């Protein structure tokens, strides 16, 4: 493997928001199920509160386990946006691959862009823009643009020999 990178959502402000959101069902369950006071002006049923808590904690767990993993070697590019997307593209299918500063594409995660196609990113604004021979495009965000540039130069030299 010539290049390997694993990214996770590590923005402090995101986890602060998720912590606040996660505190709401805990407070609701404590107040309504343990103390016996209704939680809010129009309280949910106990079952509804439990279902809401499971949903919120599942969402937080998804953010915790979500990762963008990129592996590149002389044969192919492998990208996995766990747990949602897995993609493998051989170099023979690629028309062009370059490091770009893609700017803000409406947030992080999986985004659609008119310029880059599907954008897979966790943070930042730099990525590997890939144009396929079939006309489709996608972009993989990176926090290691310099390593990726060096690797692309090595791969292109090997592929031209």
Tell where the protein language model's regions lie, with residue ranges.
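N-terminal membrane-targeting/pre-transmembrane regions
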Residues: 1-43, 120, 125-127, 137, ...
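Non-transmembrane, membrane-adjacent beta-strand/coil modules in membrane-associated proteins
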Residues: 9, 79-142
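Hydrophobic alpha-helical transmembrane segments
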Residues: 40-52
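Short, solvent-exposed secondary-structure boundary motifs
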Residues: 51-63, 110-112, 117-120
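Conserved beta-hairpin
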Residues: 53-98
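Cytosol-/stroma-facing membrane-proximal "stalk/adaptor" domains immediately downstream
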Residues: 142-161
């Amino acid at each position: 493997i010539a290049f390997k990178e694993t990214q996770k959502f590590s923005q402090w402000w995101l986890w602060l928001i998720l912590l606040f959101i996660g505190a709401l069902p805990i407070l609701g369950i404590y107040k309504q199920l343990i103390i016996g006071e209704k939680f809010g002006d129009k309280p949910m049923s106990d079952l509804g509160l439990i279902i809401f808590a499971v949903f919120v904690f599942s969402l937080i767990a998804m953010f915790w386990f979500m990762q963008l993993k990129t592996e590149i070697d002389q044969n192919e590019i492998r990208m996995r946006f766990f747990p949602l997307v897995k993609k493998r593209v051989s170099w023979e299918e690629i028309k062009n691959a370059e490091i770009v500063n893609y700017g803000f594409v409406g947030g992080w995660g999986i985004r659609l862009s008119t310029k880059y196609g599907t954008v897979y990113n966790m943070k930042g604004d730099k990525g590997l823009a890939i144009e396929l021979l079939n006309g489709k495009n996608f972009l993989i965000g990176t926090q290691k643009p310099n390593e990726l540039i060096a690797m692309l130069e090595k791969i292109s030299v090997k592929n031209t020999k």
